[in-house]
Amino acid sequence: MKTETVPPFQETPAGSSCHLNNLLSSRKLMAVGVLLGWLLVIHLLVNVWLLCLLSALLVVLGGWLGSSLAGVASGRLHLERFIPLATCPPCPEAERQLEREINRTIQMIIRDFVLSWYRSVSQEPAFEEEMEAAMKGLVQELRRRMSVMDSHAVAQSVLTLCGCHLQSYIQAKEATAGKNGPVEPSHLWEAYCRATAPHPAVHSPSAEVTYTRGVVNLLLQGLVPKPHLETRTGRHVVVELITCNVILPLISRLSDPDWIHLVLVGIFSKARDPAPCPASAPEQPSVPTSLPLIAEVEQLPEGRASPVAAPVFLSYSEPEGSAGPSPEVEEGHEAVEGDLGGMCEERKVGNNSSHFLQPNVRGPLFLCEDSELESPLSELGKETIMLMTPGSFLSDRIQDALCALESSQALEPKDGEASEGAEAEEGPGTETETGLPVSTLNSCPEIHIDTADKEIEQGDVTASVTALLEGPEKTCPSRPSCLEKDLTNDVSSLDPTLPPVLLSSSPPGPLSSATFSFEPLSSPDGPVIIQNLRITGTITAREHSGTGFHPYTLYTVKYETALDGENSSGLQQLAYHTVNRRYREFLNLQTRLEEKPDLRKFIKNVKGPKKLFPDLPLGNMDSDRVEARKSLLESFLKQLCAIPEIANSEEVQEFLALNTDARIAFVKKPFMVSRIDKMVVSAIVDTLKTAFPRSEPQSPTEELSEAETESKPQTEGKKASKSRLRFSSSKISPALSVTEAQDKILYCLQEGNVESETLSMSAMESFIEKQTKLLEMQPTKAPEKDPEQPPKGRVDSCVSDAAVPAQDPSNSDPGTETELADTALDLLLLLLTEQWKWLCTENMQKFLRLIFGTLVQRWLEVQVANLTSPQRWVQYLLLLQESIWPGGVLPKFPRPVRTQEQKLAAEKQALQSLMGVLPDLVVEILGVNKCRLSWGLVLESLQQPLINRHLIYCLGDIILEFLDLSASVEESAATTSASDTPGNSKRMGVSS
């Protein structure tokens, strides 16, 4: 025997001799046993009593050897090795049926809860596809997380929660038992709260809404695929919709005792075991589609178009020998398939016949004033303030009449820069009644009008309208629906049948038709040339920050785009664009260009804006400095656009809002915005523009202007309010003082009290010190938590506050093999305490765990696997569909209130279903009546909606913990904190 392999206490000679003696004694015993066996066999042939004695000895020997073979070091008996307990076999047909039911549920949700409101603001067909893809991604992520979830740990936590609930209810019942008469629900709830800590969500209705909103936000952040719901506004809207319209009503429904009875009947019914998958007929479903749930569908009104003509009755059990779906369920499935088929046909046919609030297709290269891209007030675009264009002083119908004169009249420009600030838009490619495509390319030069000349100009345009009516053979293509506005008093007497014509606002003077072409470009998606770029003026606006309102300057960038083609005709076709950017966005453009190695080499010799303290709230500068900075920025943009590689880069085109929305701020790091967010925002904004085309914008600068007017002399105040121009497509609504039309228009407000907004040198030093401290603290600072996010302790510890567990799973040895069985036996003994007190003694509990511990563990594992099998998930989805869409159709009217007799019948059936949870042998041993009393206590504890609501929130905390959404939330929080650095304008009130 080797020394290194033998423990120290066996290295002595005495230890070796003991080992040899034991070995020899075991051999002697074996020899004696064999000898006695031969003797007994011989005597068997002589005496029958010896046969009985031999049988008894064999039983004892089998028990002794069997316990040593079936048991382990702990002394437990593994009876599950002798009792077969099989789980549901994997069935491919069940997986396919689950996929079908998931897709069916998603389509019905989109049909009844998404498109029902989205079609009121837009008819974009791609939105439905994007929403369906996003929901499928959410379901796939949820299934992935559930597949890796520890089902045994979840079951143990749920059993612990049930045990805590029963113990607390028994204590509350004993506390209120001494009162005369029936116990009030409020008194029972107070006693229940004294026995256990209630969930924070049930403290008050406001706390419930806040907590539910946080849970929904947590689920969306962890499950919704990127980049959906990345925008703060979009996520807030979706969270509110789901919280108020889905989760809160669902929790109210789940806490209803009658609904709990129906669910228990559906889950634990005797007919719950699915039929095995037939190999020869894969088209048959693997589970019975006759749901164990009675759900009466109310008779629909006569005027309601529904494919279901009769109420659907769902049986509690499936008839024997029936493998196919019942006719009632088939009828419901046909109804759903018919509705979904009609919905798909709607998608295929399109919505060309309906009236659009806004055009579905909008050319990104050709923009007009009504859809002019907007510049944000800050990097995050916190405010959306609409302005009106100078041309809005004229009626749109009068401006439309000018398009008839462009093909027949040669107009000379009033000044050299008559085309300054012109803009055009390519509307949707709709068709006229004759089926011909309609072109909606416009040229919209700005109009600067004095109030004294307004009536004269409108009179001239009215004459143009008369000339248009006299020549009916000259027709203009229909204008986009986004340009349709109400007629003014000047043209209220016109023929209402006058077809809408192309918008073209031009200055009061001749305009050369050889300069611009009013036909759409042949290939707007092709490469374009950015030319004639200039910064025409500045706009002063204010933004709100932590310390109040701060003024800042916006620079109006205007440029033209033309097709980059060699075969272009002599008449150069142009499109005009305008975008407002602040100084910080110019710095962001320079930073993003420098961060790209392939573009950095092209901008080495380009002089960009200075980066010295760009984020300090130094107040608004005077007009001279603004003019100098404007010239520098204009030179910077011209140099960039002169380099083809830079001009065609994504950064420059995003900065100039060539293919994007200028309402989105140009930030240092670009972020992905999902198509769903873009389509929803576009539809809502377009609807608001159409609904309120001439509403007065609420400008943040109007208050500033009024304050300045009060502080200024009377004559100066009148001079400032002489002429106001408003831009309908900008976020800023400043008051612009324009005295005369100039070749190069400069919009600049001389703000009053600018010195008060400027930091002194000491204040600047103090500010820099604070920012330095923030930068030093940033790496160790924890990310900010959402106030609506559920407390992490609540999610992590499941029932730590809601209910004190009878047995903490974390304190038990993780290596034990009967953790789940021990928890279940504790719960069972709690139920049996009043009926079998002798069974709940300490010695009896040890005996039960020793003999039946592993068997109960195996039985629970099989039950958990069966309850989470694909066959069961199909059944759960069918129950959900029948609860929300009875017969496959969302009811227009609420269901009739269930009578008290129906509720009592459902309670009795639920009790009978719970009786079938335990094996029949166990029920016979314990006694049927006593088992019925114990299960009756379980149902009695679920008769209070407030207690049920507490249980639902605790159960939700358990599920959230095991879904492991913390990693996704931490990643999202890290992204948010990275964007909200200490130098961010949102925190510091930057005014550059």
From Swiss-Prot:
Phylogenetic classification of the source organism: Eukaryota, Metazoa, Chordata, Craniata, Vertebrata
Name by which UniProt lists this protein: Sorting nexin-19
Membrane topology qualifier: Peripheral membrane protein
Biased composition (Polar residues): 980-992
Organism: Homo sapiens
UniProt-listed GO biological process terms: chondrocyte differentiation; dense core granule maturation; establishment of localization in cell; exocytosis; insulin secretion
Gene designation per UniProt: SNX19
Keywords, alphabetical: Cytoplasmic vesicle, Endosome, Exocytosis, Lipid-binding, Membrane, Protein transport, Transport
Segments forming a coiled coil: none
Residue sites binding a 1,2-diacyl-sn-glycero-3-phospho-(1D-myo-inositol-3-phosphate) per the record: R582, R629
Record note on quaternary structure: Interacts with PTPRN.
